[in-house]
């Protein structure tokens, strides 16, 4: 930007201000702020990056305080703010439609028309709404943008047209999983076409059976698109 190399910070928690950019020369210095480096170590790193001929201990402390205020350090302040964001989401009974109006229409009529157009484009979907085969036991569907994956979506969910399964288990890709291998949620998922309720009893049974492989919270679902896209078709 304007001849300067910058790092643009993207924070899924939403703590770092949108559009926050960091001078690329400060990257190695930021990496050294691990609690083990001394002020002298950080001054030497500063000089190696040619940020300045010399930085006082006050300069380093001011810089570190700025990083901390921006939530770029794994500090008590960051952990407190992170825990509040996670707890606030955990307290919700619903998981809002994160991508409505961004990746697909937020208006029910426009979304229904788009889904019908996608489903009618696949061989499995060319019917009058009657089942074209037995109820599938499992489906493999994409979790990409609807327009980019329309053919694969049509082939997958066209096979469900005319069927009304009693229960659907949706296993989505977790792009932002932290702790655990799986993240379960009992939240209701509102969509422009209606609300999709979770089987809370079944979710709790899975949670108990999963033990330590299940994440202690469901925060990974907040901005995750892989399940949100499936629910539009379901």
Residue ranges of predicted features:
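Active-site histidine-anchored catalytic micro-motif
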Residues: 93-233
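Short acidic/polar alpha-helix capping motifs at helix-coil junctions
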Residues: 6-8, 234
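Long, charge-rich, low-complexity alpha-helical segments
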Residues: 4-5, 12-105, 109
């Amino acid at each position: 930007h304007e001849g300067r190399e910058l790092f643009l910070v993207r924070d899924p928690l939403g703590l770092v201000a949108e559009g926050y950019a960091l001078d690329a020369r400060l990257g190695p210095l930021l990496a050294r702020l691990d609690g083990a480096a001394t002020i002298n170590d950080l001054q030497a790193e500063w000089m190696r990056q040619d940020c300045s001929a010399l930085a006082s201990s006050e300069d380093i402390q001011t810089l570190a305080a700025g990083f901390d205020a921006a939530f770029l350090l794994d500090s008590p302040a960051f952990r407190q703010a992170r825990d509040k964001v996670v707890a606030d989401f955990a307290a919700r009974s619903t998981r809002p439609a994160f991508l409505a109006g961004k990746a697909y229409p937020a208006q029910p009529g426009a979304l229904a028309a788009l889904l019908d157009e996608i489903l009618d484009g696949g061989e499995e979907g060319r019917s009058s709404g009657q089942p074209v085969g037995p109820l599938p036991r499992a489906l493999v569907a994409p979790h990409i943008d609807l327009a980019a994956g329309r053919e694969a979506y049509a082939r997958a969910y066209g096979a469900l047209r005319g069927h009304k399964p009693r229960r659907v288990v949706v296993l989505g890709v977790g792009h932002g999983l932290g702790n655990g291998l799986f993240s379960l949620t009992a939240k209701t998922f509102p969509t422009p076409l209606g609300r999709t309720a979770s089987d809370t009893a079944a979710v709790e049974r899975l949670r108990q059976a999963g033990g330590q492989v299940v994440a202690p919270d469901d925060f990974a679902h907040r901005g995750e698109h892989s399940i949100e896209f499936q629910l539009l078709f379901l």
